[in-house]
């Protein structure tokens, strides 16, 4: 009964958030009112069964003494479901997503939400998909120690600075470090297998921190990384501008990310370019799996056709429901898909890496049960996402790389429709 009540509370909370978002509009596409991540989260929770187990929030006590705090100065937190049986010494770390804040206004706003303060985080979260503890839902990782690290810094667990006047703490890198120390003390230092994963902004974080994660663990530990919906592209928007580049430039500058970015990249590119994964993935030494839809819903909503690039609302219907797009709009999406394939081309040449690019209009497929491992889940070459990730991680197959044919050929997609 307690789990059911918690589940209802989470859904009601998300519904209220979405209603507020829809009513208030947006002035900059990335600031206070619009929250595409919240809308996507709500759509995902609608698909969730009430019987899903709820995992309580744990705050990292003492983190504040190391300056590892959320945007508002509160303690960071995580949810841990302990492993059992053959998975007792295996660890999966899932980095939460939730966009970014790129200026004073948007960062101050996040202080009043779970994206910037543990005061507003759910006290328990449902573990589904790659976090599920049921073998029929998560065949390869169900009995591992599974952790979801909450996201409250606004810069993909990167950055180390402070805005004294507004009491804003940009401490993503410190949160990452203190969380890893906590997990190592809980037993991860004895892990025989480990997987660093993440969705959206967390998927970008898994790319940024992959090699660092490898270095934390003994050389005898099998370590790999998974980025779900983390391939954010430096693309031109529908107005010919660079909405996401402008956004990332603000994040890098405001949160002082320069020193945390890959020196291999910053030696020849500007810091903003080195926050884009397309300029990072080929240089990662640790085995990495990239999972992404070719028509990523978040990027369509917020990078390709944000309100600032479409003031007349010509793209509003199309970006909410791809079935309402005209032929020229679909062609624009096909060009975006081509950019995605070009961005992963060099990465895919490595035998140790894995790839799964399906032609769906979705965002984050590892934590949704319907897209991770269900009877009617999306498939590529007859494999569901969970099966492909498992084949790659456990070396059950060689060259685990699959790229879908262009839209509309894939009939297995679970596309997101924004009402």
Swiss-Prot record:
Glycans are attached at residues 133, 326. GO terms for biological process: cell wall organization. Residues 1-20 form the signal peptide. The active site is at residues 200, 296, 363. Disruption phenotype: No visible phenotype under normal growth conditions. One of its GO terms (molecular function) is hydrolase activity. Its EC number is 3.1.1.-. PANTHER family: NOTUM-RELATED (PTHR21562), PECTIN ACETYLESTERASE 6 (PTHR21562:SF50). Belongs to the pectinacetylesterase family. This is Pectin acetylesterase 6. The gene is PAE6.
